[in-house]
Amino acid sequence: MTVETGIVVGASVSHSHASIDQIETAADGSQQTAVEELLSKEGVSEAFVLQTCNRAEAYVVANDSETGTAALAGYLAGVDDDAIRMLSHNQSLKHLMAVACGLESLVIGEDQILGQVRDAYEDARGVGGVGPTLNDAVLKALHVGERARTETAINEGAVSLGSAAVRFAAERHGVTGSTALVVGAGEMATLAAKALDDPASRVIVANRTRERAERLAEELSTTASVVGVDSVDEAADAADVVVSATGSEDYVIDTADLGGVGETCVLDIAQPRDVAPGADGIDGVAVYDLDTIESVTDEARAKRREAAETVETMIDEEFEHLMTQYKRKRADQVIAAMYEGAERIKARELRTAVSKFEAEREDGLSEREHEIVESMADALVGQLLSAPTQSLRDAAEEDDWATINAALQLFGPGLEPEPTELPTVPDGPEGVPEELRERMSSGMLEQFSTNDD
């Protein structure tokens, strides 16, 4: 019997190194379905999956990294290799913390990801994916994510063009209670839609690929609907605010689409531009382009970059705390087994001693005498195991699993000798192992010299 160290292996398919198509392939199906699939793979004992419009990540726990890597490779078989970032044990734990802090987000420090990690945790727990290893890892990530947002300025100010455009519109025209049209479903359009999610009463998403628009709409908590790009004119007529951020080479919104829409704020954050020249001259229509909006983001970006350095240091500290927590728990498994075995031996020997007293004395042991004998046995167990307990904790701190597993073989359940298997008593002090002899008093050693007397 050996103590299992629970290796975490992770895989990330995100906006930093994968296309939207690859992310969607990796995120096929629900988070719970993905966790169940991973748990069905050989050697996987725990699993956690996080899916958003900009990332699909999976983490598994196995007895070795090879088993975990094979399980994740099978799970992501349809995704291009260059779109997958594989993560070792330490990398997985740190990466998950960075994700929860918003350091891996399109917009550094954005708040939504923390709630998404929490939801993914509940999803994984719901299907039995979260065991002791991932439970500690995810809860630590959530903890450091909350610390980052309360102790630093990581989430202050608008730093993306999408969120900056919405803030710009809010300051000049107001967006609270408005109907907003978002044209596009890529990076900037997604950020704009999420920035509008709280203040707007309704969001319309228009995109050439309807599936992507629907995926974005599903992530919004406000009332959301989806239309095709060919229906932009009708959607614009119903909107108070229009944000356009497609990757089209041609104009997506022309002057005819905005004719007669009334008071409308149009934010064109696409490159090249989505809105045809001349739209700004239409009565009631105010058009703002990239040059106007980009200036809003510079100061906020600088503040978040500075905060990110503080958060990275915070992650390093919390990672060390997590590793210490893991090591202590694993050592405690062995210590518990050691005490469990000692308690069984103590109980057996107490029964033997009490039986002898009862055989030799008509009235046996009194209740007080029984308490004294049992107290002495407890004290012996505690004193004898005190030094090994500390040694095991020291071994865990030093990752000395050979010593820990050797102790488990010696003291673990099912390995105690039968009562008839008596140990060999050394003939003299020289027969006592040197390491043990150094810990024994001279009086104890002298007892071995008188064993034959």
UniProtKB/Swiss-Prot annotation:
Residues 413-453 are annotated as: Disordered. GO terms for molecular function: glutamyl-tRNA reductase activity; NADP binding. Pathway: Porphyrin-containing compound metabolism; protoporphyrin-IX biosynthesis; 5-aminolevulinate from L-glutamyl-tRNA(Glu): step 1/2. Its EC number is 1.2.1.70. The record marks 95 as: Important for activity. It catalyses: (S)-4-amino-5-oxopentanoate + tRNA(Glu) + NADP(+) = L-glutamyl-tRNA(Glu) + NADPH + H(+). It holds the Pfam family Shikimate_DH. NADP(+) binds at residues 184-189. It comes from the Archaea. Substrate binds at residues 52-55, 105, 110-112, 116. The active site is at 53 (nucleophile). Residues 413-424 have a biased composition (Low complexity). Keywords: NADP, Oxidoreductase, Porphyrin biosynthesis. GO terms for biological process: protoporphyrinogen IX biosynthetic process from glutamate. During catalysis, the active site Cys acts as a nucleophile attacking the alpha-carbonyl group of tRNA-bound glutamate with the formation of a thioester intermediate between enzyme and glutamate, and the concomitant release of tRNA(Glu). The thioester intermediate is finally reduced by direct hydride transfer from NADPH, to form the product GSA. Catalyzes the NADPH-dependent reduction of glutamyl-tRNA(Glu) to glutamate 1-semialdehyde (GSA). Possesses an unusual extended V-shaped dimeric structure with each monomer consisting of three distinct domains arranged along a curved 'spinal' alpha-helix. The N-terminal catalytic domain specifically recognizes the glutamate moiety of the substrate. The second domain is the NADPH-binding domain, and the third C-terminal domain is responsible for dimerization. Belongs to the glutamyl-tRNA reductase family. NCBIfam families: hemA (TIGR01035). Homodimer. This is Glutamyl-tRNA reductase.
